[in-house]
Design a protein with these regions (language model features):
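N-terminal amphipathic/basic leader segments beginning at the initiator methionine
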Residues: 1-43, 52
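Low-complexity, highly charged intrinsically disordered N-terminal segments
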Residues: 46-49, 53-58, 62-77
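Glycine-rich phosphate/diphosphate-binding loops that line cofactor/substrate pockets in enzymes
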Residues: 1, 43, 76-85, 274-286
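Active-site histidine-anchored catalytic micro-motif
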Residues: 4, 8-11, 64-71, 81-172, ...
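Hard-cation-handling environments
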Residues: 188-391, 396-400
């Protein structure tokens, strides 16, 4: 059995002025790509062949020429190294390529044409992916994350790949049911850490029944993409048509029934109110999410508005993580630790939502670290970072857009976040280590490309009616047929 490996992963915010270019991606080929599948050893009779996978931190639309090169390289590998029993892709599901809708559909259609109708195609998806009919017509297995924050990424990849191997071995071509659900909400309201998403996702394991229902997925969708396909969806697959249909309709209807119950899991408020509440709180640290400029949702990561308000409201014991500004990082590195610097900080990557903020402070520390997306891949790219003490606020400046999700991200720069009164992080819902850190958590409704006030965003191309834009709309689940004809196994039951 031979399975080709690859993928193209990024969450693309169409409201961002940034263009995501080749230098923003990490590209894996050959042995590094193969090594990123540690579970492959359990499939001794399977030859996994690494082709090419590109992945990037969420950002703006992808430069089309880079996407086309990656796609061309993958297709060339398929043609030159075939034949294939299967293709496995690590995907996100919310790629936007400049000038193109539904990049995943474009890629999967090309792969299907290259490998022909007999080979099976499978993919793992982020639950914030937007799934199109074209994707479902081309693919055989799609399995999505079941947690947000995403603590089951590796588990989902292994599950989807295992399903592919199983279907090839047992000669199963699954029946698929796809139900777009007209709901489009931000991840900060749909985290599986709280209700109603927690209960909704707990339904999935009980609906999976051997070959009859092999898998089921709920995709919340990605809200900051102004595309016709942007909506939530439910997918189920298996060999028993009626049971697959029942599983999908059950999940879709339950999702719809709780559509008005989704809400922020922590106090969400305007920036000034969050800062005042943090200053007044007896506990420490208070972690504030700078949600509108969250780089892990597609924000630029250089809007300095919250930092400006921290200064204006008299914060003198805090951490600001972080602001992306290569010029400012270089100035700090040239000046050196202990030097006084005068900086125009931020507002350069995203001048739409912020303008440069003048700050004066002392360089506290410098750091050069390998820039590793999700801490994997080629460590040949260095990220220059600096910490500047601005009147008691430890401002982290990075050369590259960088998430701060773990305590080690702070400690590597000489910052112990537990020692500070206020810790501001450009993030939405808190990742596990930050959640554990926070004596109190607040979500600031800050400006940026991923603004939480989604009904105010300039959508022009989403399909209406759609909740929350049309809160009183009526709907009931309608299963959509998919282009690939199912092939039931010998043990299938209807």
């Amino acid at each position: 059995m031979r399975i080709a490996l690859g993928g193209f992963r990024i969450e693309s915010c169409t409201f961002s002025p940034l263009l995501t270019r080749e230098q923003d991606f990490q590209v894996l080929r050959g042995s590094p790509l193969l090594a990123s599948y540690p579970f492959r050893s359990q499939y001794g009779d399977v030859e996994f062949v690494p082709l090419v996978e590109a992945a990037a931190l969420p950002g703006g639309p992808v430069e089309k020429s880079f996407y086309e090169r990656c796609k061309g390289e993958f297709l060339q590998g398929l043609q030159e190294q075939g034949p294939w029993d299967g293709v496995f892709l690590r995907m996100h599901g919310a790629v936007n390529v400049a000038g193109m809708d539904d990049a995943e559909g474009d890629l999967l259609a090309a792969i299907r044409e290259a490998v022909g109708p007999a080979a099976l195609i499978a993919a793992s998806y982020d639950l914030h992916g937007n799934v199109s009919q074209r994707v479902m017509d081309c693919i055989d297995v799609l399995s999505a994350y079941r947690t947000a924050p995403h603590v089951d990424g590796a588990e989902t990849i292994e599950r989807a790949c295992s399903l592919l191997v199983r279907c090839i071995r047992e000669k199963i071509r699954p029946h698929k049911v796809f139900i777009p659900v007209p709901i489009l909400l931000p991840g900060e309201k749909t985290s599986t850490e709280w209700e109603p998403a927690a209960s909704l996702y707990r339904l999935i394991p009980g609906l999976i029944k051997g070959d009859a229902v092999l898998d089921a997925s709920i995709l919340i969708g990605y809200v900051w993409a102004d595309e016709p396909r942007s909506t939530a969806s439910v997918i189920a697959l298996g060999t028993a048509r009626d049971q697959v249909h029942h599983a999908a309709v059950t999940l879709a209807q339950r999702f719809w029934n709780v559509r008005h119950e989704f809400q922020f899991g922590v106090t969400a408020a305007p920036v000034d109110r969050c800062i005042h509440e943090a200053l007044d709180a007896p506990e420490r640290p208070v972690v504030i999410s700078d949600s509108g400029d969250n780089p892990t949702a597609g924000g630029a990561g250089d809007v300095p508005y919250v930092l400006e308000r921290m200064q204006a409201l008299g914060v003198t014991d805090g951490v600001f993580a972080s602001i992306t500004d290569p010029e400012a990082a270089a100035i700090c590195e040239t000046a050196g630790p202990g030097a006084e610097v005068d900086l125009l900080l931020g507002g350069k990557l995203d001048p739409v939502h912020g303008k440069p903020l003048r700050v004066q402070g002392r360089v506290r520390s410098l750091c050069q670290q390998p820039w590793l997306l999700h801490r994997t891949g080629d460590a040949g790219v260095v990220n220059h970072m600096a910490v500047v003490d601005v009147q008691g606020i430890q401002v982290i400046i990075t050369e590259r857009r960088t998430p701060f999700h773990r305590l080690a991200d702070f400690r590597n720069l000489g910052i112990e976040p537990r020692q500070h009164k206020i810790v501001v992080v450009k993030i939405g819902y808190l990742e596990p280590e930050l959640k554990a850190l926070a004596a109190k958590a607040l979500l600031a409704l800050s400006p940026g490309a991923v603004n939480q006030d989604i009904t105010s965003l300039p959508f022009k191309r989403i399909q209406r009616p759609l909740v929350p834009f049309d809160p009183d709309m009526a709907w009931s689940p309608v299963a959509i047929g998919c282009g690939r004809k199912p092939q039931e196994s010998r043990n299938a039951r209807s």
